[in-house]
């Protein structure tokens, strides 16, 4: 039977590999196979719930970038929260780039926001930058609507990191939050809750967003220092 790695190489697109390697400066190009995401998603759907997939999910660490992406796609499909969390927590330390991190969106989180919160608190305090980035993205994805609490943006603001992709996710969170809850989020930009870099990047992202109305964009531009 063809191994998963062999299957991934059978889908290799050399042109896409070269292009994608340029988007992933922190990843050794030799670890990038060059599989387009639609093909990887189709493969994940076909592989899911097979004995081969179950074995693959226990085989960490992986060698290739696409193997980690496939791992994320398989985990995401799990509908039971309790079943998902142990293998997810084993996988989070393997996140080593923004793309795999941002791909990982478990479907069962939307129905388990109360159960997820203690994990988010733990991940926000982790010393691994992509675990922290993942936690902030989950707060952005699931807790800006009906499940919002004023405590959540405070938790994101409290994250202290010099890692570029953590700070970018903080800015993305606050720019998105402005579209949902402008009056509640604006004080984070008028005060000193955010680092100057995150503050300026938040304003930039918000001004560029199609979800922010013109009058709010004008107010945000006036806050630039």
In which residue ranges do the predicted regions lie?
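Alpha-helical scaffold domains
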Residues: 1-225
């Amino acid at each position: 039977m063809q191994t998963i790695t062999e299957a991934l190489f059978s889908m290799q697109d050399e042109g896409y590999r070269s292009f994608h390697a340029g988007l992933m400066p922190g990843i050794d190009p030799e670890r990038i196979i060059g599989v387009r995401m639609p093909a990887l998603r189709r493969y994940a759907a076909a592989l899911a719930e097979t004995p081969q997939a179950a074995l693959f999910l226990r085989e960490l660490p992986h060698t290739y970038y696409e193997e980690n992406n496939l791992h994320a796609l398989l985990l995401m499909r799990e509908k039971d929260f309790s079943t998902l969390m142990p293998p997810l927590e084993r996988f989070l330390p393997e996140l080593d780039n923004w793309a795999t991190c941002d791909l990982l969106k478990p479907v069962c989180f939307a129905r388990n926001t109360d159960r997820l919160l203690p994990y988010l608190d733990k991940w926000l305090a982790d010393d691994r930058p992509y675990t922290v980035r993942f936690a902030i993205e989950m707060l952005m994805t699931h807790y800006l609507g009906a499940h919002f609490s004023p405590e959540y943006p405070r938790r994101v603001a409290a994250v202290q990191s010099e890692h570029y992709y953590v700070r970018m996710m903080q800015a993305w969170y606050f720019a998105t939050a402005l579209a949902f809850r402008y009056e509640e989020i604006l004080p984070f930009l008028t005060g000193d809750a955010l680092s100057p870099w995150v503050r300026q990047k938040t304003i930039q992202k918000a001004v560029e967003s199609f979800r922010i109305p013109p009058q709010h964009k004008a107010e945000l531009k006036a806050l630039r220092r």
